[in-house]
Amino acid sequence: MKKFISILLITVMVILCISACGQKNSSTKEDNHTVQNRGTKIKVVTTIFPEYDWVKEIAGDEISNMDLTMLLDNGVDLHSYQPTASDIMKISDCDLFIYVGGESDAWVDDALKEAVNKNMKVINLLDVLGNTVKEEEVKEGMEAEEEEESGEEEEEPEYDEHVWLSLKNAKTLTKAIADDLCEIDEEHKDIYMRNEKAYEEKLDTLDKEYQGTVDAASQKTLLFGDRFPFRYLVDDYGLDYYAAFVGCSAETEASFETVKFLSEKVDELGLKNVITIEKSDQKIAKTIVENTKDKNQNILTLDSMQSTLSDDVKNGTTYLSVMEKNLEVLKEALQ
């Protein structure tokens, strides 16, 4: 992967150098100019859909004055994404770059070292959240990762990257985005702050609906026949969970022991539903159901927003609309 990124960076730098040679030698005079003084659109690059949608919400009508890019717009999820030379170039001269900051974004550091815009603002979601970021948890019954099976110790803890699935985290992160947009584009500072405040109220309202749903539910445990990227969500509302794999797992095949454990948990807890995430083939979930006593549990899907397409965005999908749909699924799952 590192060799791949190095080749990309060399390619990008050659292209940028050729491009620079054809420009007038005036760039040094505008290094400290604000975006509006340069008369150009604000360039914002995001990696994943939630970041992209948050910028849109904060920008409001000013989105017409932005060149906003979502890199992961073709269904590739965060854990398997590899940037193209075009992606690296977009990052290189943007005004604001927003990324998650976990292990899946290991390529970012090298990309930023070669950035043309030295005044670029960068938001690392995990850094913004600080010590509230959670380590990935291998819970009872989960399929162990290869490193753990071989007895190798990891050099450092692996953090759960799916921080956007907490509405409480979303409030913190949108505030950080708004603050940086205000510094980049002071002319529209009041608009950004007003939009961020209004969006924060929507997040608060939905957060309370989630808590109310959990408080009223008789069932407090979710069981995933799939990867589990919803750690932040369940922790926010005091829910318990079981799952086949951790959130960042690359595994797709569950062992007999894992399926047996999860099937027995369904029976033990009297669960009526087994959950998967978007794009799942549901094979593991179906096998779990087939091995329960009743064999009649529903298979539900929660959307982790890791595979949101540009077409979904064009058709009106937003962060809030996905979280609202997830709430409806949660209501059914907790029956």
Regions found by a protein language model. Give the residues of each.
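Bacterial Sec-dependent N-terminal signal peptides
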Residues: 2-4
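Extracytoplasmic metal-acquisition and chelation regions
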Residues: 6-9, 21-335
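Alpha-helical transmembrane segments
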Residues: 11-15
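C-terminal motif of bacterial Sec signal peptides marking the signal peptidase cleavage site
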Residues: 16-20
